[in-house]
Amino acid sequence: AIDGLNVLNVQTILSEVGTDMSKWPTSKHFCAWLGLAPNNEISGGKPLRTDTKPVKSRANLAFRQAAQALANSKSALGAYYRHMRARFGPPVANVATAHKLARIVYAMLKTREPYHDPGADAYDAQQQAKLLRNLKRNARQLGLALVPLPPATSVADLGVFAT
């Protein structure tokens, strides 16, 4: 089961979409049809607008409603929603999470395999590793080296405020 998707949402999605995913070659086509894919219009290197395509689809609304329900979920999708909300705000986080849910549902219906949620802790660990990897890369580009601090019990143990 996917967190955020209740019985009513699943029924709405399946009644709109069906179970045959051969209509859409990839999940990108599926998400674009739903109106959940980013619509980046760029002219001369300048972004003009980055909204999603407006569509009248009950499945679109069901995915957005499911994404909103993930705000307090202790799953990887809930952690993703909270991460995006902190970076970009609630409206963008809602659409991004709905887009992710749509890709998961597409993959489930296409491959007929269940979804396995790794959990919020796994997502947070992945984000922490990504942050550390980027920090090391940036330090290397600046000609610096990262030195891990030994586990200290207090600030005085670090010798920063030596008297």
Feature-to-residue mapping (PLM):
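Low-complexity, acidic/Ser/Thr- and charged residue-rich accessory regions of DNA metabolism proteins
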Residues: 44-49, 81-163
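Phosphate-backbone recognition surface of nucleic-acid-processing proteins
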Residues: 1-95, 117, 157
